Amino acid sequence: MQQYSILVLHGPNLNLLGKREPNIYGSVTLDEINLLLSEEAKNLDVTVTCVQSNHEGILIDTIHQAWGLHQGIIINAGAYTHTSVAIRDALSAVKIPTVEVHLSNIYQRETFRHHSYIAPVAIGQISGFGVGSYRLGLLAIVEYLRKLENNH
């Protein structure tokens, strides 16, 4: 069985987790999320590379650089979820299976957050489970990749 490399992208303002609106996003920091993902990745015999940026272009460049390097992407694009056609197009261009995750349930929040440009090019979307959304996203992408491998 192939060991998969998964890119985890955290978008704008996620570097403030633990301080920013804990009533919505919880008290866990981004470093703690990354540690949890690294530990879960070891259990699944995969590797994760975590990148956070507040800049759309850096996120896009990182997606482009993932081509041929990573077999899956987990992305929490933050507010770019609802605004960035460019991130959507980058994900579509590289054709790397992607799971979109959100800490909060975006459909229980402001109406403008109900639309995702990423969802149509992702294999799935997980939201509303706090830090668990990331863990579920990792489990989902690994299961998807293993099924894909077994079907070939």
Curated annotation (Swiss-Prot):
Molecular function terms, GO-annotated: 3-dehydroquinate dehydratase activity
Coiled-coil spans in chain: none
Keyword Lyase: yes
Binding locations of substrate: N76, H82, D89, L103, S104, R113
Transmembrane segments: none
Keyword Amino-acid biosynthesis: yes
Site positions for Transition state stabilizer: R20
Family matches, as Pfam families: DHquinase_II
SUPFAM superfamilies according to UniProt: Type II 3-dehydroquinate dehydratase
Gene Ontology biological-process annotations: amino acid biosynthetic process; aromatic amino acid family biosynthetic process; chorismate biosynthetic process; quinate catabolic process
Keywords, ordered alphabetically: Amino-acid biosynthesis, Aromatic amino acid biosynthesis, Lyase
CDD domains cross-referenced by the UniProt entry: DHQase_II
Pathway named in the protein's UniProt entry: Metabolic intermediate biosynthesis; chorismate biosynthesis; chorismate from D-erythrose 4-phosphate and phosphoenolpyruvate: step 3/7
Disulfide-linked positions: none
EC number: 4.2.1.10
Annotated active site: Y25, H102
Catalyses which reaction(s): 3-dehydroquinate = 3-dehydroshikimate + H2O
Matches recorded under PROSITE patterns: DEHYDROQUINASE_II
Domain of life where this protein originates: Bacteria
Subunit text: Homododecamer.
PANTHER family, per the entry: CATABOLIC 3-DEHYDROQUINASE
Protein role: Catalyzes a trans-dehydration via an enolate intermediate.
UniProt similarity note: Belongs to the type-II 3-dehydroquinase family.
The protein, known as: 3-dehydroquinate dehydratase
